[in-house]
Amino acid sequence: MNYPVIETDRLKLRLLTIEDREAVFRHFSEEEVTRYMDIPPCRDISEADEIIQFHIDDSGCRWGVFDKQQDQLAGTCGYHCWTTGPEGKAEIGFDLSRDFWGRGLMTEALLPVIAFGYEEMGLEVIEATVDPGNDRSLRLLTALGFCRDEELVDNLVYFYMRRNQFAG
């Protein structure tokens, strides 16, 4: 599948490449970025290369979220665990550097990414799993219209949104 560059008023989303290694290293070196992820903070530039290569090789996609004003990587977002077919679904993931928190940037990034998932990828359901301590992500998914399943799955909170629930 061809993943487009997505532009919003303040952001440019594009697939990460090896040329982004320094920015990816800085971003994923922040302990607050990786706190609720299943990876430790990057300690070596080669770990940034591995993150980029994982997203290039994976069956999903990961956009770098670039702040247009500062021309800087603010975070990443995208899909993984993608299945096709009549009940096509994928898990959405996202992260944002602390310097960009509280400005509504991830909401701005995810709205067109969700629309792309339904319109171009043919998804019927978009899922997310969140650590119950990650209040910002819990609030973001709720604000975007995801339904929260109160049962914890593997000690994570499960969210989902069906195509017909998206008000984007």
Roles of regions detected by a PLM:
Residues 1-36, 62, 66-168:
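Acyl-donor (CoA/ACP) binding surface of acyl/acetyltransferases
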Residues 47, 53-56, 125, 160:
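Juxtamembrane helix-loop transition sites at the ends of transmembrane segments
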Residues 32-53:
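Conserved GNAT-fold acetyl-CoA-binding loop/helix
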Residues 52-66:
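A short helix-loop-beta-strand connector motif used in the catalytic cores of GNAT acetyltransferases and
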